[in-house]
Amino acid sequence: MEMALRPQSLLCPRSRLKVVIRPASSASGGGLAQYFLMTRRYTGSRIVRCMVSSSDCPNRKAKRTISLHTEVASSRGYAPRIAAESSIQEREHINSDEETFDTYNRLLRNESTEWKKLDTTEVDLSQDVSSSSMRKVDATDEAKLDILEDDLPRNLLNGVTMGEVDMLDEAGAEDDVFEVDLSALHNSTVGKMDAVNEVGTENDLFEVDLSALHSAAVGKVDVVDGAKAKEDLFEMDSLALHSVTMGKVDAINAAGAEGDKFEVDLSALASNNSMIEAVNVMDEAKAIEDTLEVDLSGNATSSSTYGEVKFEVDSLGNTSSTVMYGPADGAYEPRSDEVTFKVDSSENASNNVMYGRADVVDESWADEGIFEVDFFTNASSGAEYGKVDVVDEAKTDDFTFEIDSLEKDSNNKMHGKAHMVDEAWDDEAIFEVDLFGNASSIPIYGEVNVLDEARADDGKFEVDLLGNTSSNSTHEEVDVVDEAQTGEATFEVDLLGNALSSAIYKEVPVMGGAQDDEVDVDFSINASITETEKEADAVDEARVEDETFDMDLVGKQISIDSMNDDVVEEGTKHHRYPMLSSAFIEVKTIHETPVSLKPELMSVVMDQEQDKPISSVYQQEGSIFNLHAENQSTVDFHEREQMAITFDKQKESVAKLSKEDQQTAGLPEQNMSFDGVHRKSQSIIGLPFQHQSIVSSPEKYRSIVGFHGQNQSIISSHKQDKSIVGVPKKIQSIVGSTKHDDSIVGFRKQDRSIVSVPEQKQSIVGFHKQDLSIVAVSEQNLSIVAIPRESQSKQISIVRRHDPLHLKEVETKDRDGISKKSGGDDDLPHMLFEEELSQVEDVARAIAYKKQHEVDVISLTPDIQESPQDNIDPQELRRMLQELADQNCSMGNKLFVFPEAVKANSTIDVYLNRNLSALANEPDVHIKGAFNSWRWRPFTERLHKSELSGDWWSCKLHIPKEAYRLDFVFFNGRLVYDNNDSNDFVLQVESTMDEDSFEEFLVEEKKRELERVATEEAERRRHAEEQQRMGEQRAAEQAAREQAKKEIELKKNKLQNLLSSARTHVDNLWHIEPSTYRQGDTVRLYYNRNSRPLMHSTEIWMHGGCNSWTDGLSIVERLVECDDENGDWWYANVHIPEKAFVLDWVFADGPPGNARNYDNNGRQDFHAILPNAMTNEEYWVEEENCIYTRLLHEIREREEAIKIKVEKRAKMKSEMKEKTMRMFLLSQKHIVYTEPLEIRAGTTVDVLYNPSNTVLNGKPEVWFRWSFNRWMHPSGVLPPKKMVKTEDGCHLKATVSVPSDAYMMDFVFSESEEGGIYDNRNGTDYHIPVSGSNAKEPPIHIVHIAVEMAPIAKVGGLADVVTSLSRAIQELGHHVEVILPKYNFMNQSNVKNLHVRQSFSLGGTEIKVWFGLVEDLSVYFLEPQNGMFGGGWVYGGNDAGRFGLFCQSALEFLLQSGSSPHIIHCHDWSSAPVAWLYKEHYAESRLATARIIFTIHNLEFGAHFIGKAMTYCDKATTVSHTYSKEVAGHGAIAPHRGKFYGILNGIDPDIWDPYTDNFIPMHYTSENVVEGKNAAKRALQQRFGLQQTDVPIVGIITRLTAQKGIHLIKHALHRTLERNGQVVLLGSAPDPRIQSDFCRLADSLHGENHGRVRLCLTYDEPLSHLIYAGSDFILVPSIFEPCGLTQLVAMRYGSIPIVRKTGGLYDTVFDVDHDKDRARVLGLEPNGFSFDGADCNGVDYALNRQQSLLGLKPAVGSTPSAKGSWSKTGPGTGLPWTTLNCTIQLTNFEAPIQRWQEKASIGRYYKLNETWLKVKIFYLSCRYKLTQTWFKVKIFYLSYTYICRIKTLYSMHKQLWEYVSAMFPILSFNYEYLI
C-alpha cells in the first residue's frame, strides 16, 4: 500500500517536488506511524497517525489511531509542514504492484455558519521499540490563537532518546500554559517542552520538572509568558540519587502586582555527597534595589549588604561528620526602602550532606537588583562553589549575571564563571561566561561575551571555549551582532579544536539591504575521534521581500565538499564556502564512529520533473534530518525541501547544532543552575530586545548559542506564508501546543495560585515577561528554541494530499539522487536561490487558486473516533468492501458507504460507481456536500479510483459531531453534476443532534461570533477614543502654552508702560519710608490728604495690589493719622509682596465693600516703583509656567466636566429609552400585552389578548399565529396555537418560546385555525421588540427627499421632522441619506465637509451634486445650473415647477449613482411628485426594490399634489393619530384610507436638551430644575429688558398665521398683562399684512407696558431655546395643528404647555383636570392645560385654572418623561412640574366666568338665546332663516368644518357660538357693538 500527498493545494506551489511517504518495517511487522495534517480554513487542522502494513508482514492489521489531546488553531487555513521519517530498522523495498498505501483525503472546509478562527492540530507519538528513534514535528500558525497539544507516552530501553517540544502562541488568549515532561531510564533522556507565548495574557506560569536515575536527567518545563502579565510563576523541583542534583525554584514576578513572593527550599535525599537546593524568590513591584548575598561555608559566618536590601547568613558546621542545613526566610515590606533577609544554617550530618534554603526578593521595577550567592563545601569527594550576581534594571544601563562554580574533585574539576550584562533599553548588553577546569582528563574552559543592542548599530556575541585535553578538546567562539532595527546583524560561530593537525573553517558573509539583518555562523570542531563542522548563514530582512538562507552541515560524514559563491540581486547576499578538501576527516570520522551512532545515508526526495535532488547528505545529529537505516529516505514537508532551516523577511533562525555540540552556558550536572527572572527582555544567554529567555543545565558539555533581533527563532522562521520546522534528533518541537492531561493552567490575577506538580518532576526554567524563548534540557544535547510572537502567526503552509506515487519509482529516484550527490554542492546555492525567488510566484498562485476554486474545508476534530476498518484485517476488509460493491452493483445502486451505519464524529468511505452515474465519461470525479440540509461545514473532495473490481471511485469523509444529516452531489469539478435527479444525495447520521438542537447550536455559534465582533469593535472604539483623547490633550497643552505666552506678552507690555509712569514718591502727596526697600520688606506709606477728595473723611484706607493689579486687590490697610505740622499726613504699614516690581493702590474712606469716596489719582491710580526693581527673564518664565499650569488645570477640569456630563447624558438617554419602550408596550395593553412586559430572547412569555376591543369580539375561539424577526425568522411562520382563557376571564392567553436569535416578535389573531377573520392591527400586524437577542436586525437603506431640513433650510416643523426622524432611524443602525435642494441662502457653516460629488444632465439642464454632513447625516444637495434655487427662499414663485424638477433630479441621481434604497420617503406636497415619477419612470429600473412612503405634514397646502401622491405611494402617514382622523374624510385622503396611518411626531432629544444646551445660561436637569429655570428666566428678562420680578412669564413661539390662532394670541397678550404677568413672543408672519398688524401691536404694548412685554417679530433659533427655558408657560392656541412640536419642546425644557385640543396637541398634552384617565390608559401622566373652544373664553379658562396652583412649588427631583414631561407632580394637583421656578400666584387674573358646567344652558354664559342668534346672524348678512337645518348645513360657511363631531344640541349651540365669535375679528365685526 502506498500513500502520497498532492502538492497542488491551496498554498503549496505547483513547482514543488512531489513527496511520497513510505511505510517502515520492524521486526514485529508493524509499520511506523505516518502523520498527515488535515486543515480547514477557519477552524483548524488535525494530525492523523496511521500504522500501515508493510510487505514483510502483509497479514498485520493496519492500525489507525487518532491523537485525542491536541488542538492547533489557525485563522487562515494555513497548516504546518510535517517531517515524517521511518524507523532505523532496515526493510525491504516494496514494488508498486505489491502493496500501496490507502490514500487519505485532505478534508477541507470553509463554512459560513462557523465563525471560529481556530485551527487544531493533534499529535500523538508512541512507540514500543528498542534502539530506535522517532521524530515528529508539527507547527501551526495563527493570527489570534495557536493551540497544539501533545501526549508523549514512552517506554524506552537503553540508548533510546526521544524529545518533543510543543509551543503555543496565543496572541489574544487569557492564559499561558507551558509544560514539559522528561523521563528516561538508564542513561536515557526524554524531553518535552511546552511553550506558550501570549502577548496579552493575564498570567505567566512556568514549570519545570527534572528527575533522573543513575546519572540520567528527566525534566519537565512549563512556561507561560505574557507581555502584559500580572504575575509570573516559576516552579522547579528535581529529585536524583547518586550524584544527582535536585532543586526547586519558585518565582513570582508581577510587574504590576501588589505583592510578590519568592520562596526557596533546598533539600537532599542522597547518601553520597548529594546536594538539594531550592530557591524561592519574591519579586516586588515597587522596591528600589534588591541585594542578596549568601555565603554558606563549612565553618564560616557571612553577612553583607548591598544597596538597600540586606541579606544575612549565619552558618556553622563540622564537615567531617555533620550535615549542613540552612533555611532562609525572606520578609518584604511593600513600598519600603529596605528589605532584610536572614539565613541561619548549621551542619549536623555524618556524610557531608548540605541542605540549604534561601529566600530572595527581586524587584522587577526596581532601579537595580543584585543577586549573589556563594556556596562552598569542603567534602572529600565533591565540593562546589557558586556565585551569582544579578543586576536587573528594566530601564537602566546594566544587567549583570555572574556564575562562578568550582568543583574540587580528584577526577573531575571544573571552574565556571558567568557574567552577563543585558540592557533591554540601552545601547549595550554584555554576557560573559567563563568556565575553566583543571582536571587531568576533561578540562574545559569557556568564555562568552554577548553584546545585545536592541536599538544600537552594532552587537557582538562571542564564545570562546578552549580545552587542552589529550583525547578531546574544544575551542569555540561565537560572535553575534544583534541589530533589531539596524541595517546589519552578524552572527558568527567558530568552533575550533586542537586535537588534530587539520582544522575546518567556514565563513559566510551576507550583505543585505538597509533594513536587513546579517548573520554569520561558523562552527567547527577538530577532535581526534570525531570532527564536526557546521555553518549556517542566515539573513533576516525585517523589511524586504526576499531572503536567502544557506546552511551547510558537515558532521561525522561529510557529503558536501564545496559550494559555489552565490550573489543575489535583491537584498544582495554573498556566500563564501572555504572548506578543507581532505577526505580523510570524513572517512576517518565515519569509520571511527561506533556502529550504534553511525549516521546513515539520507536523501531528500527528488523533483520528479527534473529528476534531481536538492541535496543529499549523511545524517547529522542536530540537523533537520534524523538517523536512518541503510537505503531509507526521509521526507521533510518544507515548501522547498531545505536541508536545515529556512527563514523569512521578519524572522530568523540561527543554526542547528549537533548532539555533541548543542550546549548552553550553565552549570554542570553536579552544580546548581540559576535562572534569571526579569521584567522586560533579560535572561541568561544572548537575548533579543523583547524576546529573550534561556534555561539550561546539560551534563558536562557547555556551549553558547545566541539569538537576536526583534523576532528571531533558533529552530525555525518563516516567510509570509511558509512554515519550516526542523529540530535535532533528541530535541523536537511542535509549534503551539498544550496538553489536556497535565498542562498547568494560568489563572487570572485574583484567582491565581502556585500550581503544584509531581514530586519528582521539577526543574528550573528562566523566563521573562513579554516574549518567551525555551531551552530544552537533555543529557548531552541542548537545543535553544526561540518562538517569537510574530513568527508563530500568519505563516503556515497547507500540506495537501498528493497524488499516489509508487514506492519503486521513488526509490529509483532516491538512488539517482544519491548517485548525483557529489555534484550537488554546486547546485545547492542555486537551488536555494531559485526556491526563494519562487516564493512570490507561489503566493500569487495561491491567491489565484483561491479565486478559481472556492473549496470549503472540513477538519478532523481532535476527538475523532476510530474507523471500524482500522480494526479489521486488510484482506478481510477488502473482501467485505468487494461484496458490498457487487451487491450494490447488482441492485443498480451507484453509491454505498462503509460502514453502512453513518455515525457522527466518525470517518466513512464513500464509494461511487462511475459507470452508473452521470459522470461515466468524466476523468475526474468530485463530491460536494454539506451537513444538516446544506447548512453546516460545506466541503468539496476528490474521489480516486479504488482497488475494487468495477468502476468504483472512493474517498473518505469525516462526519462532524454536530451532523445529523449528510447532503451531497457528485460532479466533474466543473459543470457536469450527478445530483440524484435534482434531489441530491442524503444520508442520515446517527447523532445526538437533531434539527432543533442544531438550530440552538447555530444560535449559540452566532452569539459567540457576535460577542467576539462586539469585543473587537469595542476595543477598536476604545483605541480610537484613546488616540483622539491623546491628540486633544496635546492640542490643549499647546493651546495653553500659546495662551500663556500671549498673556505674558501683554503683561510685559503693560508693566513696561506702567514703569514709565511709576514714581518712588510725589512731593507733598505721598512717599515711602525707608527710601530703599525690596520685595518682602515692610515699609510705611505716607499720604497727605490735604486738598484731596478724602480731606473730610474720618477714615482712610489703602486698597492696593502690585504689578498693575496682576493679583487683584491683595493689600488692604487702614491709615493712621500722624502728627505733622507740614500737612494732613496719614500713614500705614505695608508689606511688599515677593514678586512685586510696582506697587499699585488707591485711597478710600472705608474698607472694600463699604467705601464710597476714593482718591484714585484722577483715575490713574497711584503707582510706586521699587528701587532698583528690574524684571528678569526667570521671573517671566516662572510666571508663564504658572499661567500655563492654571490654564491646563482649567482645561482638564472642563474636560472632566464634559466627560461626566456625557456619561450622565448617556445614562439619562438610556433611561428615557427604557421608559419610552415601556409606555409603548402599555399603550396597547387594552388590546394585547405580554407577561413579562419586556420580552427577552431565549425565554418563555405569555401573550394576553383582549378580543372585546377588536374585530374578534364575541368569537368563540381565537387562534394565535406568530413568528419572529419581521416574519423572516429561519423557523418561519409557526403553527397556529389556540388561546385559552385566563383566570380573570377577560383575556385569552398563549405561551410562546422566544428563540435566542429573535429581535422582534410578530403575531396576529384569527377566529379559527384555518384563518377566517383576522385581527392584524389594520394590516400592520402586532410587533413587540425582543431584547437580549444575539442577532441584529438587518439594516435598511432609507432615502429622504424633502425641501426643508433643520438647521440649514427651515421654515416650519417639516424641517425638524426630517432631521430628527433621520437621526433617530440612523441611531437604530440603519443607513439614512437625505436629498435636499442646494439653496443659495443655506448656512454652510452647519454643513461639514461640503464638496462636489458629481454632476449629471437632466432634460438639458446640468445638475451638480454636492455632499456634506448635517447633524451627522449624509446629505446630497442638488443644484440645477439654471438658477431655480438661487432666489434666496424655500417657498416663493413657481414652486410647483421648481420642486417638480428637484424630485425628478433626485430619482435620476439615485439611478445614476447606483444606489438601491429600500425606502424612498417623500414629505408633503413639495416632494409628492416623487411618488408618481417613480412609479411611471423608475419602477422597472435598478430602483425597483424601493418602496415609496409619503408623509402629510399639513393638508392645508397642495391638496391636489397630495391626492395624486396618495394614489401612487405604497404607504402614507401623517404626523399624529388625531389629525389622521380629522382629515380622513378629505377628498384627497378618503379613497386611500386603507394605507393611511397616523404616527405621532417627536423631537430630537439631543438637540433639545437643557442639560447640554449652549444657548441657555445654566444647564439643568430634574435635579436642579429650580436653579436652572431661575437662571434662564433672569437671562430672558435681561435680554428683553423686562422687569426683574418674580411673576409668571408666558412664552409664545409660532408662525403668525390664521392656523396658529392669531386672534387668540392677541387676546392672551392682553389678558396676561392685565393680570400682572409678562409675555414674550417670538415669530413672524409670511403675510405682510399680518406682520404689519403685529408691528403696530408691538409698538403699542411696548409703550403701555414697558418692562412687561416684548414682541420679537422675527425667528431666532438660539433665542427660542432661551424662551423655552425661561418661560413658565408656553401658549399654543392653534385652530388646527397636525402635530405641533412647540409643546413637546416646552415640556422638554420644563415649561407648562397651554394648548387647544386639536390634532397632535390633543395627542401629546393631557389636561391636569380632564385627561387623567386618558393619560393613565396610555401609561402617561397629566402634563399641561388644554381648552376646547376657539375663542378668547377658552384661553381665559385655561389660564384661570392656574389659581388651583396657589401656594404650590415645583417638585424637585423629577425627570422629563419621553414626551418631555416630568415624572413627579406638584402636591395635591397631579400636575407634572417641569416648569415653574417659584410659587405661581396668578392673583390678579380675574375670571369673568366660572368653569363651564356640562349641563348648563347657553343663556347662562352668554345671555343669548336662540331668537337673538336668528336675528343677529341674519343681520350679519347670513340672510338665511336660522333653523336647525341651517346649523347643520351652513356651519362650514362660518369657517368651522368639524361640527360633525358634536352630537348634542347643547354642544352644537355652545361650540357654534365659539366658532362664530371667533370669526368676528377676522371679518372685522365688532360683535360687542352689535350686541
Swiss-Prot record:
CDD domains: GT5_Glycogen_synthase_DULL1-like. It holds the Pfam family Glycos_transf_1. Disruption phenotype: White-core floury endosperm. Increased content of resistant starch (RS). Endosperm containing increased levels of amylose. Reduced content of long amylopectin chains with a degree of polymerization (DP) of 30 or greater. Reduced content of amylopectin chains with a DP of 6 to 8 and a DP of 16 to 20, but increased content of chains with a DP of 9 to 15 and a DP of 22 to 29. Decrease in average length of amylopectin chains. It catalyses: [(1->4)-alpha-D-glucosyl](n) + ADP-alpha-D-glucose = [(1->4)-alpha-D-glucosyl](n+1) + ADP + H(+). Its EC number is 2.4.1.21. Residues 1014-1043 are annotated as: Disordered. GO terms for cellular component: amyloplast; chloroplast. It comes from the Eukaryota. It is found in: Plastid, Chloroplast; Plastid, Amyloplast. InterPro entries: CBM25, Glyco_trans_1, GS/SS, Ig-like_fold, Starch_synth_cat_dom. Keywords: Amyloplast, Chloroplast, Coiled coil, Glycosyltransferase, Plastid, Starch biosynthesis, Transferase, Transit peptide. The keyword Phosphoprotein does not apply. HAMAP family: Glycogen_synth. This is Soluble starch synthase 3a, chloroplastic/amyloplastic. It comes from Oryza sativa subsp. japonica (Rice). The gene is SSIIIA.
